[in-house]
Amino acid sequence: MRTHFCGLIDETLIGHTVTLAGWTDVARNLGGVCFIDLRDHEGIVQVTVDSRAIDQNNSELFKVASGLSYEDVLQVEGVVCARHAVNDKIKTGKVEVIATKIKILNKAAPLPFHAHENPGEDIRLKYRYLDLRRPEMQRMQRTRIKLVQALRRHLDMHGFQDIETPILTKATPEGARDFLVPARMHPGEFYALPQSPQLFKQILMVAGFDRYYQIARCFRDEALRADRQLEFTQLDMEFAFVSERDVQDFVEEMIRRVFKEVAGIELDTTFPRMTWTEAMRRFGSDKPDLRINLELIDVAALVADSTFTPFTDAVAHPNGRVAALRIPSGAVLSRKQIDEYAAYTAKYGATGLAYAKLAPIGEITSPIAKFFSEDAFAALLSHIGAEKGDIVFFGAGNYNKVSDFMGALRLKAGKDFALITADWRPLWVTDFPMFEWDEEAQRYVALHHPFTAPAAIDDIDELRAHARTALSRGYDMVLNGNEIGGGSIRIHRPEMQRAVFELLGITEDEARAKFGFLLDALNYGAPPHGGIAFGIDRIAALIAGTESIRDVIPFPKTTGAQCLMTDAPSSISEEQLSEIHVITKKPTP
């Protein structure tokens, strides 16, 4: 049907007859000469039909060309010629195709939007097949395709085995909410769609496969946002007989190589490492964006003698924190804007946001200055490094809560004051706490997942005695404030796994019912093993330069968890429900 792609026609083909196929991007009738921009997945080439040529066929061609509409599907035969007016904006701009035949393969109905428009997201998702024709969307999808291909090449080259794991599996409700599938042949029982292949890949290590990977589809029934979908894709990896450093060194090299191959992006030769504690202290986040040159500064020692109750209460509390954030040139903020920052931090748990504004010329404006002696307040600002023209914000209260809202403030200030540099800043965050205490549930929860090994603790009694302070062998790869990969060294001894389940409030009977197959596998000579999973959607979005992963997923769901193109989810007939032994119940208002 075609001999060449539109976007690959060049000067080497001048004088040759070619057959092309594609869509009508633009059709222009300029007084007897018709110009058609014919588009396929490789690009655009200009097709010319001149009614003034001494050829009966040309007048017929001109009639066809004159009647074309946007997105009509064509087959064109013609001769490649040098173009008189070169178009440097397209790669085929030095040539054109003088048409000798045009066949309309399919007429397009009037479009809800044109390929060169950028309509609202709902209409784009409803007509996703039209949205994906847009050059920008084609570019982003190709970025994703190249990313996956490059990852596969690298892993295949290093002896990893691509092994599929089940999509219909057992519900293990320890993370997000599962998607459940009724088991028709087992009335009243359900499969679950996998939130990750975590347990299967560990069992593959027990089975002796040594190096595993999979481009895995994962499913989590959770609230959606710009960087989260109900179904998503991850590069899942696992290694036998490795330490944390073995895993990190390998995937660091892989990510450096893939970023350069896919997008020409040069990442640091060695990624810096930062403990979870340091990341929270300096940046108020376990996924710090190092492009923003702002840090939180602990000032508890300098405010302890003040009479400002929020500060002194935080200093007196064993888990309290008083932190400051200096924003260079931030004194331009009005009182209204400062109040907006306070309202913003309130979303993250702040009960107030103190400040000190150092005018370029004049006095310091601060509602908390009266609670300090003049020398003490000057010493506080000096310790922070505040200069004329700056503003300093203060947060006080529970350590984790202060870290969270001051970290959020740091990110917002970085954006608002254009402090984010245009580079790539990867790092490893390590030494996460093994557990978090859930006040509401009155029990420990795993910070990573229940299968992560504790660090520097081999004795079960020691783990029980130091559960609050125990660190895990977990690690995250962070890039520009995004967690792009997370992994750990796993528990490979069944008695340690049982102890962790116990600390998480999972009884022996529950552990056997939910994870008995894993505990059994660990009994039969499980090797030390570890791994990592990378978010393909998130990495593709970063490389493509978009803030929403929906742009790099061919058929994403809306934030309302719907597919507007197929109208999913949809109702099911009573007959189908009966076959799978399910009765639906609408929620009460």
From Swiss-Prot:
It catalyses: tRNA(Asp) + L-aspartate + ATP = L-aspartyl-tRNA(Asp) + AMP + diphosphate. The keyword Aminoacyl-tRNA synthetase applies. Its EC number is 6.1.1.12. Signal peptide: none annotated. Belongs to the class-II aminoacyl-tRNA synthetase family. Type 1 subfamily. Residues 198-201 are annotated as: Aspartate. This is Aspartate--tRNA ligase. Catalyzes the attachment of L-aspartate to tRNA(Asp) in a two-step reaction: L-aspartate is first activated by ATP to form Asp-AMP and then transferred to the acceptor end of tRNA(Asp). GO terms for molecular function: aspartate-tRNA ligase activity; ATP binding; nucleic acid binding. The keyword Aminoacyl-tRNA synthetase applies. GO terms for cellular component: cytoplasm. It is found in: Cytoplasm.
